[in-house]
A protein has these predicted regions:
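C-terminal extensions
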Residues: 95-125, 151-212
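A glycine-rich phosphate-binding loop feature that marks nucleotide/adenosyl-phosphate handling sites
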Residues: 10-13, 47-52, 87-102
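Single conserved hydrophobic/aromatic residue that forms the stacking wall/gate
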Residues: 1-9
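Residue-level signature of tetratricopeptide-repeat
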Residues: 143-144
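A conserved mid-domain beta-alpha-beta active-site/ligand-binding segment of alpha/beta enzyme cores
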Residues: 13-19
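Radical SAM enzyme [4Fe-4S]-AdoMet core and its adjacent flexible, acidic
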Residues: 2, 19-80, 140
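C-terminal accessory region of radical SAM enzymes
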Residues: 67-97, 124-127
């Protein structure tokens, strides 16, 4: 735990992959640090055996960069999107989906909440729609006071429609005729290569061989 200038810059770093904890356990620790210790930020670092010390664990697939990325995405959901760890993971399902970001994965497992009507949903509901960020949600709420919004408006606002289109309607209509089916939407989302950042795709570690 680091402190600076009072306790304004409290932060914690966790090394990922050196010990056998699941993502669920790691995120529960982070959630506790935020809620009970008022931490400003938790950092996650993929374990790298820099000195090749034989006493340290060897990770055949290389540093778990994709796992680190998913933890950061989930951390963002905790801090800015009102998610709780127990909504994202459980003891029976303790690790994040490597193929999908945590928000998309949550939405797929809770299709009963979708589609969301853009012109009526409140701010907190909009936050849970894949492809809609905090700024976009605020802009939607503000813009629809003047006029009903359509999909072209959402694109201008900054909504990532290639993800959001499966989960929203504008004035009762979806962007395209779309089946609200978990397998169908999952396959479509996985086909979106932005689910895995380019720098990780290009890293060349064995952990990414599933995506080649």
């Amino acid at each position: 735990l680091s402190r600076g200038l009072g306790d304004v810059y409290k932060r914690q770093q966790m090394i990922i992959g050196a010990t056998p904890e699941h993502d669920y356990e790691i995120m529960r620790v982070a959630e506790t640090l935020y809620q009970k210790f008022d931490l400003k930020r938790v950092f996650y670092s993929a374990f790298v055996n820099v000195n090749h010390d034989s006493n340290l664990p060897v990770l055949p697939g290389g540093p778990p960069l994709l796992r680190e990325h998913r933890l950061y995405q989930a951390d963002w959901l905790l801090r800015y999107y009102d998610f709780k760890v127990d909504e994202l993971l459980t003891k029976d399902r303790p690790d994040f989906n490597i193929y999908l970001d945590p928000k998309c994965d949550w939405a797929l497992r809770h299709l009963e909440y979708f589609p969301v009507e853009i012109n009526r949903a409140d701010y907190h509901t909009l936050l849970r729609v894949p492809g809609i960020g905090a700024k976009s949600a605020s802009r939607i709420v503000k813009a629809r006071r003047m006029n009903k919004l359509d999909f072209s408006d959402l694109k201008k606002i900054g909504v990532v429609l290639k993800r959001a289109l499966y989960f929203i309607t504008c004035s009762g209509r979806m962007m395209y005729p779309t089946k609200l089916d978990e397998d169908y939407i999952c396959r479509s989302l996985i086909a979106d290569r932005t689910q895995i950042p380019r720098e990780i795709r290009e890293a060349g570690y064995q952990q990414l061989s599933l995506f080649s």
